[in-house]
From Swiss-Prot:
One of its GO terms (biological process) is adenine salvage. Its EC number is 2.4.2.7. It comes from the Bacteria. Keywords: Cytoplasm, Glycosyltransferase, Purine salvage, Transferase. PROSITE patterns: PUR_PYR_PR_TRANSFER. It is found in: Cytoplasm. Its main location: cytoplasm. This is Adenine phosphoribosyltransferase. It catalyses: AMP + diphosphate = 5-phospho-alpha-D-ribose 1-diphosphate + adenine. Belongs to the purine/pyrimidine phosphoribosyltransferase family. Catalyzes a salvage reaction resulting in the formation of AMP, that is energically less costly than de novo synthesis.
Length: 175
């Protein structure tokens, strides 16, 4: 029987700011069976896309992507916030509603032609996805898909990537 993951996501009104509904995945993470089931679904998706490596943006992308990579037996590459990686890095900036931010990856993290699936907890405006995809492509990788626990469809992040296969466990249309 399929799991309705939406039943296990807590909706928190006015967090972190008034008028925002925060979708909290920690109830899934706190339940080993749910966490494993969510990981398994994303891993099945990544396998179907031919993923050779999983990339997850800091920080919740680590929580989502690492177990997917482990289940598939492939590597995991973190896309980190600035000044967190010790060797030479590639950088990409992205916009937020209140400013901008930067993600970095080691320059040798992705091999040319390597097939990559990006895993993260949530896609809203897709700024993080843009930056992560740009990093991977600048390093010669091929982004073959992106997988999320949650997609906020009203924010139209998916529409910015008409040629990218995107998978989400849960969709909310009342972002």
């Amino acid at each position: 029987m399929a799991i309705d993951f939406k039943e296990h996501i807590a909706s928190v009104q006015d967090f972190p700011n008034k008028g925002i509904v925060f979708r909290d995945i920690t109830p899934i993470l706190q339940d080993g069976k749910l966490y494993r089931a969510a990981t398994h679904e994303l891993a099945d998706y990544a396998k179907s896309r031919g993923a050779e490596v999983i990339v997850g943006p800091e920080a919740r992308g680590f929580i989502v992507g690492c177990p997917v990579a482990t289940e598939l037996g492939v590597g995991f590459v973190p896309a980190r916030k600035p000044h967190k990686l010790p060797r030479e890095v590639e950088s990409a900036s992205y916009d937020l509603e209140y400013g901008s931010n930067v993600l970095e990856m080691h320059k040798d993290a992705i091999k040319p032609g390597q097939k990559v699936v990006i895993c993260d907890d949530l896609m809203a405006t897709a700024g993080t996805l843009h930056a992560t995809k740009e990093l991977i492509e600048n390093l010669g990788g091929e982004v073959v898909g992106a997988a999320f626990y949650i997609e906020l469809t009203d924010l139209k992040g998916r529409e910015q990537f008409p040629d990218l296969d995107i998978y989400s466990l849960v969709k909310y249309s009342d972002a």
